[in-house]
Amino acid sequence: MRKEVKLGDILDYEQPNLYIVRNSNYDKTFDIPVLTAGQSFILGYTNEKENIFKAKENPVIIFDDFTTASKYVDFDFKIKSSAMKILKAREGIDIKYVYYAMQNIKFDNQLHKRYWISEYSKIKLLIPDIKIQEKIVKELDLVIKVLDYKKKQIKLFDELIKSQFVDYAIFKNLEVA
């Protein structure tokens, strides 16, 4: 059985101020990722040890309050700015199911303003029983895993084609731009 609910009725949010990184001296050798909900997602890594959000134990969605971009996070992290919300699932809700559902929401975010409280949290979704949510997540995870594998294959084939072209051009004394 499915029920129609508002996002704000199934997700709690936390202001991220406690988890904001204090310096931006990032280094790949550091352990803790610094996140943004935008395109880049992982901005770098910090060696700061205090006030780390523990998403490895309880996954969350980070939600950019201005762009409405969101990312599913299941590892410990710090964040870059307070322009996001950390969304947590309430009991009986699979956070990853909600994340997948949010990726399909069409939303006009053209104005420069915060959206979660005023508008986005009021968007309604059909939510099935938790067992069905978990089954859907399992299926979608598998599809995404296959897609990621296929993308890697395409990249490797593209590199192979380029290298074959270069080899051919060298063999035939052609110029390669």
Model regions and ranges:
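A specific heptad-register position in long alpha-helical coiled-coils used by two-component signaling proteins
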Residues: 141-144
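Non-catalytic DNA-recognition/assembly elements of restriction-modification systems
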Residues: 1-19, 24-40, 124-137, 149-177
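DNA target-recognition domains and sequence-specific DNA-contacting regions of bacterial/archaeal
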Residues: 5-125
